[in-house]
């Protein structure tokens, strides 16, 4: 039992460095934006206690109950994330709901990208702005310093973060302990802030401010940004360590700091704008700025890694075109680098920093994508509860009304800042959604066209009856589906008038599970004297590799010797069939993405000297 406890404790320790980076750095700006933003709330006991009560109950209802107790129950072999939730919702739902669940998953992925653009800029700027508190004449240098940190952060992605990653957890542990210490010290001088644990103060605040509460709630949302990481990173650490880290250290530390900032506002007659840095004695200020900068870099790294992981999932689900994915660690499958995603995210983050220039300006843009993802996760959770968990309707309706109602309120509150900057993550999210939707739709259309072509069984029977010249060795033809005759096979027969001694029709099938067990990797069926059909199963967290595929086939009795196997692929050239402006635009965009997508031979690591590619024209 002792080793198991040590393992759980160590995983909980590591989870602090990855899972809670984003939500853990929220005290830098969340409370400040309520009382010192462009539309500040008056500093008085009713307002301070009301905001603290709202933050506390947001932690309880959104983070603790909704995500840690309910959403995390929906997993695929321990893996989580919004695309996983979407895939689970599609499994047993009626056909119309499957389509809706798929579109919601794609939309949430787009919003996650929009949030990922804001998070590094917001976090790093809010930390570096501490310099202006310690040395006001250094204020003009805040933006350049923050941008240099961002440039360095994105530059090291190609080298991987395995070496420095081991320091993430100790740094974040120190960060949370400092948060707790600073907050507890302030609470000692104004213990009356603890009365905000009573929900009556939140209710009184809402009644006091009426319709203006919506605007203020949009700022309270900043305290729970990053909550989706709890679910997305579940596969790396397990839900138990993530829960232990939250309830044992992260939540108490964050609440102590927020309540400490509230105590600071109540004890000083003229408090300054930076409520977080004002908690520290002057002698601690520079070390605290340095620690905050490290913590925000770690939070940004967690978001960047999350984008890489989400991009790989989307590619394997068929929502994005294939891209180059590099593994940066020999020991961890999760350590990956996606150059295209890294460059797009870097350019977007730099643009956002130049456009908004300060964390105060960025606060208006932050939050709306988060609440949109929360809303989508609640909608998908209702589908999962009804059709996957088989809950009865009264129970489903109860959680639906509770969480969808709460998320609607939060989404409406962040929408009040739409014109001040909230449009940016929404615009980015919608652009990503359109890209993913067009790719998925047109790719599905290609599969349907392929399925309407020649029957595989009839084609094989016809070929076996013909007397073709036989070449030595094995030919592997990649096909889109089991019912699809590879164009490369047809062209090989038409122009070379030859068949190999052994011919393998190979299909890659991506499963709604993170990883496929090696014994289930390959399904092999000999359909005639010289033809085999092979289905290779790939999880959405895996990368296909032809060397591994050949090894798995050998374990099942189909030996593919590297020096005796030839791979024949068709390289498609797509043409637009004129059917209307919107249709033509979608197909044109799909064709452009196809041209720039990673080639199948590169994605599968097929040796160039064993590869033959044949050009094929197809009209869409």
UniProtKB/Swiss-Prot annotation:
The keyword Transmembrane helix applies. The keyword Isomerase does not apply. It catalyses: K(+)(in) + H(+)(in) = K(+)(out) + H(+)(out). It comes from the Bacteria. The chain crosses the membrane at residues 11-31, 51-71, 100-120, 138-158, 167-187, 202-222, 246-266, 288-308, 334-354, 364-384, 396-416, 418-438. GO terms for cellular component: plasma membrane. It is found in: Cell inner membrane. Pfam families: K_trans, K_trans_C. It is a multi-pass membrane protein. Keywords: Cell inner membrane, Cell membrane, Ion transport, Membrane, Potassium, Potassium transport, Symport, Transmembrane, Transmembrane helix, Transport. PANTHER family: LOW AFFINITY POTASSIUM TRANSPORT SYSTEM PROTEIN KUP, OSMOTIC STRESS POTASSIUM TRANSPORTER. Transport of potassium into the cell. Likely operates as a K(+):H(+) symporter. Belongs to the HAK/KUP transporter (TC 2.A.72) family. HAMAP family: Kup. This is Probable potassium transport system protein Kup. The gene is kup.
């Amino acid at each position: 039992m002792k080793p198991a406890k040590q393992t759980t404790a160590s995983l909980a320790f590591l989870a602090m460095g990855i899972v809670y980076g984003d939500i853990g750095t929220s005290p830098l700006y969340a409370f400040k934006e309520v009382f010192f933003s462009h539309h500040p709330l008056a500093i008085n006991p009713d307002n301070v206690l009301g905001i603290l009560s709202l933050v506390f109950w947001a932690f309880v209802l959104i983070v603790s109950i909704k995500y840690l107790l309910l959403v995390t129950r929906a997993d695929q072999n321990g893996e989580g994330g919004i695309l996983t939730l979407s895939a689970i919702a599609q499994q047993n739902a009626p056909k119309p709901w499957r389509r809706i669940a798929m579109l919601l998953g794609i939309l949430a992925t787009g919003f996650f990208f929009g949030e990922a653009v804001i998070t590094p800029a917001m976090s790093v700027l809010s930390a570096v702005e501490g310099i202006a508190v310690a040395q006001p004449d250094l204020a003009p240098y805040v933006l350049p310093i923050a941008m240099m940190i961002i440039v360095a952060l994105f530059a090291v992605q190609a080298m991987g973060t395995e070496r420095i990653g081991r320091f993430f957890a100790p740094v974040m542990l120190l960060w949370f302990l400092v948060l707790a210490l600073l907050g507890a010290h302030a609470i000692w001088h104004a213990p009356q802030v603890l009365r905000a644990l009573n929900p009556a103060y939140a209710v009184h605040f809402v009644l006091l401010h009426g319709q203006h509460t919506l605007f203020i709630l949009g700022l309270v949302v900043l305290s729970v940004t990053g909550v989706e990481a709890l679910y997305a990173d579940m596969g790396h650490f397990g839900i138990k360590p993530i829960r232990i880290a939250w309830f044992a250290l992260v939540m108490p530390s964050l609440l102590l700091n927020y309540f400490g900032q509230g105590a600071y506002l109540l004890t000083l007659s003229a408090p300054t704008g930076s409520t977080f840095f004002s908690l520290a004695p002057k002698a601690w200020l520079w070390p605290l700025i340095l620690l905050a900068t490290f913590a925000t870099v770690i939070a940004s790294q967690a978001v960047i890694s999350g984008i890489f992981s989400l991009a790989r999932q989307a590619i394997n689900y068929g929502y994005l075109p294939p891209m180059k994915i590099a593994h940066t660690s020999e020991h961890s499958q999760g350590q990956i680098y996606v150059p295209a995603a890294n460059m797009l995210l870097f350019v977007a983050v730099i643009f956002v920093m130049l456009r908004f220039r300060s964390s105060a300006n960025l606060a208006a843009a932050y939050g709306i994508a988060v609440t949109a993802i929360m809303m989508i996760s609640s909608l998908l959770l209702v589908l999962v509860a009804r059709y996957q968990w088989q809950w009865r309707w009264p129970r489903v309706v109860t959680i639906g009304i509770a969480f969808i109602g709460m998320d609607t309120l939060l989404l409406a509150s962040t929408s009040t800042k739409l014109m001040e900057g909230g449009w940016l993550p929404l615009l980015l999210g919608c652009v990503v959604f359109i890209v993913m939707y067009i790719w998925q739709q047109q790719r599905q259309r290609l599969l349907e066209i392929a399925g309407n072509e020649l029957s595989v069984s009839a084609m094989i029977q016809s070929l076996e009856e013909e007397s073709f010249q036989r070449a030595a060795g094995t030919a592997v033809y990649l096909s889109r589906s089991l019912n699809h005759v590879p164009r490369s096979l047809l062209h090989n027969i038409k122009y070379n008038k030859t068949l190999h001694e052994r011919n393998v029709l190979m299909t890659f099938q991506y499963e709604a599970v993170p990883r496929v067990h090696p014994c289930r990797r390959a399904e092999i069926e000999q359909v005639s004297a010289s033809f085999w059909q092979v289905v290779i199963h790939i999880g959405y967290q895996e990368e296909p590799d032809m060397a591994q595929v050949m090894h798995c086939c050998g374990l099942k009795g189909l030996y593919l010797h590297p020096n005796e196997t030839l791979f024949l692929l068709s390289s498609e050239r797509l043409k637009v069939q004129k059917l209307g402006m919107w249709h033509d635009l979608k197909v044109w965009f799909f064709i452009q993405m196809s041209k720039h997508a990673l080639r199948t031979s590169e994605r599968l690591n097929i040796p160039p000297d064993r590869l033959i590619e044949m050009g094929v024209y197809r009209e869409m």
